[in-house]
A protein has these predicted regions:
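Residues at alpha-helix caps and immediate loop-helix transition turns in enzyme cores, especially N-
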Residues: 49, 98, 150-153, 178, ...
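Residue-level signature of transmembrane alpha-helix interfaces in integral membrane proteins
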Residues: 53, 83-85, 99, 136, ...
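Residues at the C-termini of beta-strands that transition into short coil/loop
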Residues: 90, 142, 199
Length: 223
């Protein structure tokens, strides 16, 4: 008979995080603060999309941004130029944020004067999808150069998101990217997901994205 214990750490970590996430979500709802968790792989255009999003909505919402990275403050410096409130979060080598880290970030950001908070999660299609941050909605970006088969390779990320932005559609003619095939792969995983093709560089699709956000913020505040 073995004289040692086996502790299922992963299950315990997820269960604890889920509890923290629900508590945070209730606090955000009470305070009427909408939190968007934005995820993608590195280089998909998250920061450029954020800049376009802030430009479209800054006159309607008090926007605060949390930039999560393993290191550096390049993205926070970029977002600061938009006039939005911003804080840089260093994860100390971790490839995701969990609910506890997100709460720390919100406290550091200061949300008394923020009604729309955006978390730009660490660039990664695996780890961020596994941890509930306590967000109101989950969004992800897939860029055209990454390929239309990413939903087949990273199904969890596409399964847990409420909206998918397919970015860099302005360069689609130069890549072997089948938009309809991509839609089909995503819908198999998540029939209810909203899919919005955009180009953060040219502005195409940003109006539809901004409209979706307006609707979701309003619904959140009316719950």
């Amino acid at each position: 008979m073995e004289g040692f214990r086996v502790l299922e750490i992963k299950k315990s970590v997820f269960e604890n995080n889920d509890r923290e996430a629900e508590l945070l979500r209730k606090e955000l709802k009470r305070d009427k603060t909408f939190l968007l968790n934005l995820m993608s792989s590195p280089g998909s255009g998250k920061t450029t999309t954020l800049k376009a999003t802030i430009a479209a909505l800054k006159d309607e919402f008090r926007i605060g941004v949390m930039e999560a990275d393993i290191d550096s403050d390049v993205d926070a410096a970029t977002i600061e130029k938009t006039g939005a409130k911003v804080i840089q979060l260093h994860t100390g080598g971790m490839c995701h944020l969990d609910a506890g880290m997100t709460k720390q970030g919100l406290e550091g950001l200061g949300v008394d004067d923020v009604d729309f908070a955006i978390l730009e999660n660490v660039g990664n299609l695996v780890c961020p999808a596994e941890f509930d941050t306590g967000s109101s909605k989950n969004a992800m970006i897939l860029s055209v150069p990454e390929g239309d088969d990413k939903p087949l390779k990273y199904p969890l990320m596409f399964s847990i998101c409420d909206v998918l932005l397919i970015n860099k559609i302005d360069v689609m003619p130069y890549f072997d990217f089948d938009l309809e095939a991509c839609r089909k792969y995503v819908r198999r995983l998540n029939p209810n997901i909203k899919i919005i093709p955009i180009s953060a560089r040219t502005g195409e699709g940003i109006a539809e994205w901004a409209d979706w956000l307006r609707t979701e913020v309003k619904a959140w505040n009316e719950q």
